[in-house]
């Protein structure tokens, strides 16, 4: 059986009060529309068409790696009109098409699979996703036959007294036999107060043709649409609970899961402990037995097993197993830190490689450098990598000891097994096995304060 999907993503999203199209706003680190696309893919649906309109260039940019086809809805004339705009995608296809909305990011791949299975096994012409709620005010009601089939969808304003008591509501997500859908679209009109073409009318047209219409009921959170910043926040809360629950089931400890913020594509190994206030973003991988103390942020990075991170920021970097980072360290993009290293408080590292067992304990800046293994950086070391025009490189070999308050003026090389005296400014290569001293000779002027009249009696 051939299955495909259409995702409606052309809405203006006026209530978002944003210059960006609504569907590219993110929930737990991923654009809403990409949540829907990815879950459709996980349900083994290969052919996906995205109906775009306002901000189409931006939507395409955010979905360019999803292997989609696109249909353009130049004017927003309703959900039915959006599907009409995708008729070319359905041309000459036979099978089943599901229709989803790009602003409902909480739909799961399990529900999508269930929708197709229910629709195809029951040989329905159309199937919709519904939900039951305590207060259905404002929603279209699903009215069923005695057999359980869907009889009709009645908008709230059109409900009679009995229909108002129904708490099963329409989600705006459907499955259709492609041939039935295309035939029904031919009879769709905009004879309503808004002058728009509604997809709900296709259900009525299908039913009047004598075809079977079914519905599956799912939890309300799966059909939640996002039309405002408030609803975006509500969707974020639901998604975050799902993400954190998944990691806890897989063996991750959360000291307070309600104040821990993890993006949807993050991977975390078992026996890792995460303290409150941590933010883990993007395509980050954290391996087993790590400890992330409060208020740490990690983005698009790989953290090896047994790493401890305390009150620190790690961006687009790799940290080797057994390393400790922080408190208050800043690891900037393109940094690779080896195994069992120590990156201490108020250390900033940018675009550098740090070898195994190297210690950078405090108050140090390292930029555009290659640092070997078993090195020690004294407090206040600065790699001076910018010459006013471009960044220069520093190379430090294995077993180098860098004394406190040392400036390494790039480009410069410090070879293996070297010592640099505290307070030095190094501008030339330091040979292997040597001690480098580059500071002014101390001069003591006896009686100077007395001569200047500054000596306190």
From Swiss-Prot:
Binding-site residues for UDP-N-acetyl-alpha-D-glucosamine, renumbered to this chain: 8-11, 22, 73, 78-79, 140, 155, 170, 227, 332, 350, 365, 376
UniProt region (Pyrophosphorylase), positions on chain: 1-229
A GO biological-process term: lipid A biosynthetic process
Active site, UniProt feature: 362
Enzyme kind, highest EC tier: transferase
Pfam families: Hexapep (PF00132), NTP_transferase (PF00483)
Coiled coil: none
E.C. numbers: 2.7.7.23, 2.3.1.157
Residue span of region Linker: 230-250
Cofactors (names): Mg(2+)
Annotated Gene Ontology cellular component terms: cytoplasm; membrane
Catalytic reactions on record: alpha-D-glucosamine 1-phosphate + acetyl-CoA = N-acetyl-alpha-D-glucosamine 1-phosphate + CoA + H(+); N-acetyl-alpha-D-glucosamine 1-phosphate + UTP + H(+) = UDP-N-acetyl-alpha-D-glucosamine + diphosphate
Spans annotated as N-acetyltransferase: 251-457
Binding positions for acetyl-CoA per the UniProt entry: 385-386, 422, 439
Keyword vocabulary terms for this entry: Acyltransferase, Cell shape, Cell wall biogenesis/degradation, Cytoplasm, Magnesium, Metal-binding, Multifunctional enzyme, Nucleotidyltransferase, Peptidoglycan synthesis, Repeat, Transferase
GO molecular function: glucosamine-1-phosphate N-acetyltransferase activity; magnesium ion binding; UDP-N-acetylglucosamine diphosphorylase activity
Cofactor note: Binds 1 Mg(2+) ion per subunit.
Location(s), subcellular: Cytoplasm
Pathway it works in: Nucleotide-sugar biosynthesis; UDP-N-acetyl-alpha-D-glucosamine biosynthesis; N-acetyl-alpha-D-glucosamine 1-phosphate from alpha-D-glucosamine 6-phosphate (route II): step 2/2; Nucleotide-sugar biosynthesis; UDP-N-acetyl-alpha-D-glucosamine biosynthesis; UDP-N-acetyl-alpha-D-glucosamine from N-acetyl-alpha-D-glucosamine 1-phosphate: step 1/1; Bacterial outer membrane biogenesis; LPS lipid A biosynthesis
Binding of Mg(2+), residues: 103, 227
Subunit record text: Homotrimer.
Function statement: Catalyzes the last two sequential reactions in the de novo biosynthetic pathway for UDP-N-acetylglucosamine (UDP-GlcNAc). The C-terminal domain catalyzes the transfer of acetyl group from acetyl coenzyme A to glucosamine-1-phosphate (GlcN-1-P) to produce N-acetylglucosamine-1-phosphate (GlcNAc-1-P), which is converted into UDP-GlcNAc by the transfer of uridine 5-monophosphate (from uridine 5-triphosphate), a reaction catalyzed by the N-terminal domain.
Similarity-based family: In the N-terminal section; belongs to the N-acetylglucosamine-1-phosphate uridyltransferase family.
Name of the featured protein: Bifunctional protein GlmU
Gene: glmU
């Amino acid at each position: 059986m051939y299955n495909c999907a259409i995702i409606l993503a052309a809405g203006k999203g006026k209530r978002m009060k944003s210059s960006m199209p609504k569907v590219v706003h993110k929930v737990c680190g991923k654009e809403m529309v990409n949540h829907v696309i990815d879950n459709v893919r996980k349900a083994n649906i290969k052919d996906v068409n995205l109906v775009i309109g306002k901000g189409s260039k931006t939507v395409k940019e955010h979905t360019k790696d999803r292997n989609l086809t696109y249909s353009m809805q130049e004017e927003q004339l309703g959900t039915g009109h959006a599907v009409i705009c995708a008729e070319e995608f359905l041309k000459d296809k036979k099978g089943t098409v599901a229709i989803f909305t790009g602003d409902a990011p909480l739909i799961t791949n399990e529900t999508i699979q269930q929708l197709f299975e229910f629709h195809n096994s029951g040989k329905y012409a159309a199937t919709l996703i519904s939900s039951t709620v305590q207060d259905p005010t404002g929603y279209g009601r699903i009215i069923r036959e005695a057999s359980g089939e869907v009889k009709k969808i009645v908008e709230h304003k059109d409900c009679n007294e009995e229909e108002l008591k129904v708490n099963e509501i329409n989600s705006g997500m459907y499955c259709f036999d492609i041939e039935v859908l295309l035939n029904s679209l031919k009879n769709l009109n905009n004879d309503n107060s808004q002058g728009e073409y509604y997809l709900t009318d296709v259900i009525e047209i299908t039913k009047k043709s004598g075809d079977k219409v079914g519905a599956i009921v799912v939890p309300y959170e799966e059909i939640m649409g996002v039309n405002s910043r408030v609803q975006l926040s509500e969707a974020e809360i639901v998604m975050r609970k799902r993400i954190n629950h998944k990691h806890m089931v897989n063996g991750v400890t959360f000291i307070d899961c309600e104040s821990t913020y993890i993006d949807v594509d993050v991977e975390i190994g078992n026996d890792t402990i995460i303290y409150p206030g941590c933010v883990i973003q993007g395509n980050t991988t954290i391996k087993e037995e790590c400890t992330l103390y409060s208020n740490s942020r990690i983005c698009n990075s790989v953290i090896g097993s047994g790493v401890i991170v305390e009150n620190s920021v790690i961006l687009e970097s790799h940290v080797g197993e057994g390393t400790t980072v922080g408190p208050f360290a800043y690891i900037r993009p393109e940094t690779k830190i080896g195994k069992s290293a120590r990156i201490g408080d108020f250390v900033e590292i940018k675009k550098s490689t740090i070898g195994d067992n190297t210690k950078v304990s405090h108050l140090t800046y390292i930029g555009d450098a290659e640092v070997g293994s078993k090195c020690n950086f004294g407090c206040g070391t600065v790699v001076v990598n910018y010459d006013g025009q471009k960044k220069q490189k520093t190379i430090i070999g294995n077993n180098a000891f860098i004394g406190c308050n040392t400036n390494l003026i790039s480009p410069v090389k410090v070879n293996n097994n070297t010592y640099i005296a505290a307070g030095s400014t190094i501008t030339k290569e330091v040979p292997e096995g040597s001690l480098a001293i580059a500071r002014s000779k101390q001069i003591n002027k006896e009686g100077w304060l007395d001569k200047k009249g500054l000596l306190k009696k």
